[in-house]
Swiss-Prot record:
Principal subcellular localization: cytoplasm
Annotated keywords: Aminoacyl-tRNA synthetase, ATP-binding, Cytoplasm, Ligase, Nucleotide-binding, Protein biosynthesis
Catalytically driven reaction(s): tRNA(Trp) + L-tryptophan + ATP = L-tryptophyl-tRNA(Trp) + AMP + diphosphate + H(+)
Motif ('KMSKS' region): 252-256
Intracellular or extracellular location(s): Cytoplasm
Protein name, as recorded: Tryptophan--tRNA ligase
SUPFAM superfamilies in the record: Nucleotidylyl transferase
Enzyme class: ligase
Amino acid sequence: MDDFKVTPWDVEGVVDYNKLIEQFGTSPLTDELIEKTAELTKSELPLFFRRRFFFSHRDYDKVLADYESGRGFFLYTGRGPSGPMHIGHIIPFFATKWLQENFDVNLYIQITDDEKFLFKEKLSFEDTKRWAYENILDIIAVGFDPDKTFIFQNSEFTKIYEMALPIAKKINFSMARAVFGFNEQSKIGMIFYPAIQAAPTFFEKKRCLIPAAIDQDPYWRLQRDFAESLGYYKTAAIHSKFVPGLTSLEGKMSASKPETAVYLTDDPEEAGKKIWKFALTGGQPTLKEQREKGGNPEKCVVFKWFEIFFEPDDEKLMERYRACKAGELTCGQCKRELIERVQKFLKEHQKKRKEAEKKVEKFKYTGELAQEQWDKAIPEPLRT
């Protein structure tokens, strides 16, 4: 029996990503696909690909073939606004930005304020709408192209419900229950919701690519069962690993456990104190033993954060690994360096977040892609 669990709502234990590929029936992101990405974009690959933070896919090979043939593709991702965003939430958006820039494609970002109202008992609809605005500022701060990006909030972009109806007609309860584990206690809004989440995959008559954490994959499995019957492509996806919280390599960073997370709106000084107090290290019990035996970067959250986001230079990362194993580097040194980088990131992000307040209207309503979507009629196959 596996000692980890991954669902769209819960991640527990130390995840074995190779086993997860088998469980979910996805494919590994191979060296060949990574090299093909570099060849087609003529760009240096970001660390998310080089270090296999994105490790699994569905039909990414077909996405690259579509791009090479001139058919193109589009990107779709999203955010469920149930509270403030933390570093674990934002990292996949940086990978999405790289894909948008280097393939020069449209991006649709769904803000699911309706979903979080349905799935979170303690949240009112006003709460999720308020968090939607706050989360949108963080997303805009990443630096997407405002004319090629449409950020839409489900409670406002009600056309999504019209598009969801024919999709809902294709999904019976047993299909939804098999994927999501719904039961007699599940609210009827929750049972309908997968149709709304699938609707943006039909925004264009091209293949859709979804960059997302692997726990979100079940939503797209259903879409792949019926997309072709509506005259569209099965959606493709590339899956990321999880960013661990400060206190453990198990599970993922969680907003429900504040000591595990660094929030994007945290005061940089307070974030530093949090890292110093809570970040798990792979060091020995004493400095003497650390010097003699070396540390264990494989068991260290601090090293993992450097690997995932905060050390872009591969050679410097490997030197950090070597110095840790050799006992030349102490946990205190590593923590201090990580704190400096996290604080620098937060200061830059928060400055861009403030600037994003003036850009919300363009991303949601007046940018080229936004206007096109507000003006566009419901696609013919989704009117039946």
